[in-house]
């Protein structure tokens, strides 16, 4: 067995309460549940990856994640970790309904390979920038006290961009957006908004909300995934008529999906998440999107810094993203640093530049 051969793969569950109920059009949760993967090589080098659970992939639950890892382990043990990209392709082909698990495994393999090779994650991504600033998500709610507290906390932490979850209920969406705007305007500080429909809208209801926010003069930058992920006809129509850029999330998990989007004219940009696409495929999507002058957003699931850090370092290292949506750690109790990443409110900074 070569020194870079995979010796062992272990998993553990992480279940943590959220500091606020995370509610979208797809559901709500008060705690997060991820499976953490540890890959150990013959020479002792290790890498960690995270497989989160999400409303987006309800069948990819903790039990299913563990089952896939257990079934995949025999085919991975003994192989050279430098083949991580090929192994990820194999896993995605064999388990097409388990993209986040394949991504978590790939991230752990990739990190073990980096450790074995003496490479730094940030530098491997390009080392282009050492700081990024994220937005923060405002969940669907009618709780006046919560909204006031959540926005007040975010303002004190230095957030300037707010991604509001909406669900196609006209009255509720108007109230929530209006309340957030009123609270932010009261601070006297500049701010911007993003809307995230999580597949809850029709073409007409989306255009109606776009018209409303424009009429009210709200500073909205974009509308993320308003329609069903596979509503290609609707996305094409919406892309043509929407006054706001349409950013696709659930519609794009792979470069093949993005090729369809580009060829059919289905959106103005894409939300790239390491948690859903992994390392190799995420970078391929970045490259393809840039070549076609699409807007790029760096996003995440509800995940710990084990998984989120890969997205942060990708965004920093490539400096390729127009929008940063890497805020999941702010739904958890957390420290002010993780490895070489410092966490200062809305800002992530690389704090160790010796490597």
Where are these regions (language model features)?
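Structured loop/turn residues at beta-strand edges in well-structured enzyme cores
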Residues: 4, 157, 218, 265, ...
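Catalytic core of soluble alpha/beta enzymes
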Residues: 164, 170-301, 305-309, 332-343
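Short glycine/serine/threonine/alanine-rich loop segments
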Residues: 78, 119, 244, 294, ...
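Short glycine/serine- and small hydrophobic-enriched flexible loop segments
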Residues: 111-115, 287-290, 312-316
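Structural signal for conserved beta-strand scaffold positions within catalytic alpha/beta enzyme cores
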Residues: 136, 271, 325-326
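C-terminal alpha-helical cap/extension of soluble enzyme domains
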Residues: 302-355
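N-terminal capping/lid subdomain adjacent to the active-site entrance of alpha/beta enzymes
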Residues: 2-193, 198-207, 211-214, 241, ...
């Amino acid at each position: 067995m070569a020194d870079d051969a995979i010796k062992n793969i272990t998993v553990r569950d992480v279940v943590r309460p959220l500091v606020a109920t995370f509610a979208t059009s797809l559901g709500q949760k008060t705690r997060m549940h991820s499976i953490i993967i540890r890959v150990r090589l013959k020479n002792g080098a290790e890498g960690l990856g995270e497989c989160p659970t999400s409303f987006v992939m309800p069948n990819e639950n903790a039990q299913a994640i563990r089952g896939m890892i257990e079934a995949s382990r025999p085919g991975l043990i003994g192989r050279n970790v430098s083949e991580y990209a090929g192994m990820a392709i194999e896993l995605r082909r064999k388990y097409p309904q388990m993209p986040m698990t394949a991504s978590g495994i790939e991230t752990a393999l990739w990190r073990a390979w980096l450790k074995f090779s003496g490479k730094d994650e940030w530098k491997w991504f390009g080392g282009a920038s050492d700081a990024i600033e994220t937005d923060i998500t405002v969940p669907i709610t009618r709780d006046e006290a919560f909204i006031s507290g959540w926005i007040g906390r975010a303002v004190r932490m230095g957030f300037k961009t707010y991604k509001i979850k909406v669900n196609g209920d006209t009255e509720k969406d108007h109230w929530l957006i209006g309340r957030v705007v009123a609270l932010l305007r009261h601070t006297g500080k500049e701010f911007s908004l993003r809307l995230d429909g999580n597949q809850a809208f029709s073409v007409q209801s989306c255009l109606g909300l776009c018209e409303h926010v424009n009429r009210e003069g709200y500073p909205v930058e974009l509308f993320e995934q308003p329609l069903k992920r596979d509503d290609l006809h609707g996305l094409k129509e919406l892309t043509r008529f929407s006054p706001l850029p349409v950013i696709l999330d659930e519609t794009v998990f792979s470069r093949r999906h993005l090729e369809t989007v580009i060829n059919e004219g289905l959106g103005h940009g894409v939300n790239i998440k390491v948690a859903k696409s992994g390392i190799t495929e995420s970078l391929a999507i970045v490259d393809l999107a840039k070549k076609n002058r699409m807007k790029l957003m760096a996003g995440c699931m509800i995940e710990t810094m084990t998984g989120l850090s890969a997205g942060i370092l990708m965004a920093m290292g490539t400096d390729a993203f127009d929008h940063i949506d890497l805020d999941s750690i702010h739904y958890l109790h957390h420290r002010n640093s993780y490895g070489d990443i410092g966490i200062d409110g809305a800002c992530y900074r690389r704090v160790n530049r010796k490597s």
